[in-house]
Amino acid sequence: MVSVGTRAWRWSRQIAAPFGELDCALFFERSLVKPVPLPANSLGASIRSAEETDLDMICQLYAGDAWLWLGNGPRDETARGLYLDRLRRGERCFLAFVDGVLAHVNWTCFTWGDALPGHPIRLRPGEIYTTDAFTPSPFRGKGMHALVLGTMLAEARRNGAQHAYTLGQLDRPDAHKGLRALGWQECGRVLYFLPRGAARTSFLCRYGMTEPLFRD
């Protein structure tokens, strides 16, 4: 059953839709001081870092998801350049394949990453930011996100990272459960409104620990 709060939130977003996007971002953190347990690889997936030649495949997946896609529409070719810039500045994209089929995409950022519209997260030494996780529908519910995320965190820890951050959406509770199961804790929320046609959001309310999102 959908809660009253959820219905009210959906109604608020519908009311705001003609004027822009009303959204609530959940900010999560996780310590990397202790070893990161790796989930089981039940599908026998292979995981590797993406290369520039993989970008067309990655963009094809992201283009249908407005939360992940960095373009203004599914055919916005400038988005590819933004993902290319990520790779060239040293951020890492992890790809998981099952029997040669792409089963998951995820990113680890070490310097800065796209977070709230027009407000990137600026990272300090020892911090990482994971973002833009995507699992194609045939592989959802099969542990791919947990497997790749665990691999990313473990590798970052081996390379000296001590703290990780990520963002979630209020209306994706299943994803929040998965993060908490992997040791993440919600530490803050940001309510914001992005006017139609704008590139930078206006903040309506924020609470909890959100400081890393506002270092710019």
Which residues make up each language-model segment?
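Conserved active-site alpha-helix within GNAT-family acetyltransferase domains
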Residues: 9, 170-189
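Conserved acetyl-CoA-binding loop-helix of GNAT-fold acetyltransferases
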Residues: 132-135, 141-157, 181
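A conserved beta-strand-loop-helix scaffold within acyl/acetyltransferase catalytic domains
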Residues: 66-127, 131-138
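Conserved GNAT acetyl-CoA-binding A-motif
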Residues: 156-168
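Conserved catalytic-core motifs of GNAT/GCN5-like acyltransferases
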Residues: 28, 185-200
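Charge-rich, low-complexity intrinsically disordered segments
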Residues: 181-183, 197-216
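Short secondary-structure boundary/hinge segments and terminal tails
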Residues: 157, 174, 196-198
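Acyl-donor-binding surface of acyltransferase catalytic domains
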Residues: 1-61, 68-73, 78-82
